[in-house]
Amino acid sequence: VLVISIWEKIGVLHNHFLVHLPPITPNGLIIRKAMYVYDDLDQRIINERVAQFQDQMDRYLDGKIPEEEFLPLRLQNGIYVQRYAPMLRIAVPYGMLNSQQLRIMAEIARDYDRGYAHFSTRQNLQYNWPKLEECPEILGKLATVQMHAVQTSGNCIRNTTTDEYAGVIAEELVDPRPYCEIIRQWSTFHPEFAFLPRKFKIAVNSVEGADRAATRMHDVGIQIIRNEAGELGYRVYAGGGLGRTPILSSVVREFLPEEDLLTYLDAIIRVYNQFGRRDNKYKARIKILVKALGVERFSELVEAEWEHLKDGDGKLPSEELERIKSHFTEPDYL
């Protein structure tokens, strides 16, 4: 975990990994380049979530919601209660920020924390000294720059990560960020996967021969490849992780067609949701399930589940993929 004075280091970070933006236009719109932009539905969902959590917080502070009921509500909004103060974890999808987002996070660090924040190893940002009652207000400020803390904690699908130089590194097969964004949109508020046996982490890599996203240390790793016919698709890994039981993931499918990304992920997580342990949180990650079943048996279960899904509504339409890709233009210096 990298600890920085976010206010003082803002200039240094600009030069390293930020997208620079023109100013806000007269109608209040932010002109963005090279990253996904919320549409009206995206923004409305986040605004409604902030208002909902503000109401839940008010009722909790008034004693109308007991502690055990408030626990999953705060976790769903990225809040851990630690020894001295709450910790609020902010999602930074596939590690990409623009300058306005970083400035808002710096203001939050200055006004609601102690001038510091932690960038985590999985491309999130954490505040360690906010007041619990001020967290909805913080989330409201983040919503103004299209950020949130949804699914940054709890037993759900977490932030999808990729290479920190995605989109600019010469060795990548294609830009992996559109695929990360597709996974983000699919997994956020997914009703079936809100209460998994344990947290679930996905990483995407697009450099063949170099695991630049540490995909084999994730619950699911997606390696973008081309088959012998030149078709774009994925090699899929499952069952990796660190912690007290570090395991490198295994290949569960050598080639998955590009349009089948979400249906196959759906199948993997359904198998995990059904067979993963819930009696011991230290043995509840998918890596333990894959090891217990064996990768061959686990793959058979996934393939059987996928048979029911692969020709359904979850197949990724080419026009939707192109729409997402259109947000990720090359920077001027390439």
Regions inferred by a protein language model and the residue ranges of each:
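Short, low-complexity, intrinsically disordered N-terminal modules
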Residues: 3-4
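Short hydrophobic targeting helices and cationic amphipathic motifs
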Residues: 13-21
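Peripheral terminal and linker regions in Fe-S/redox and tRNA-modifying enzymes
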Residues: 27-334
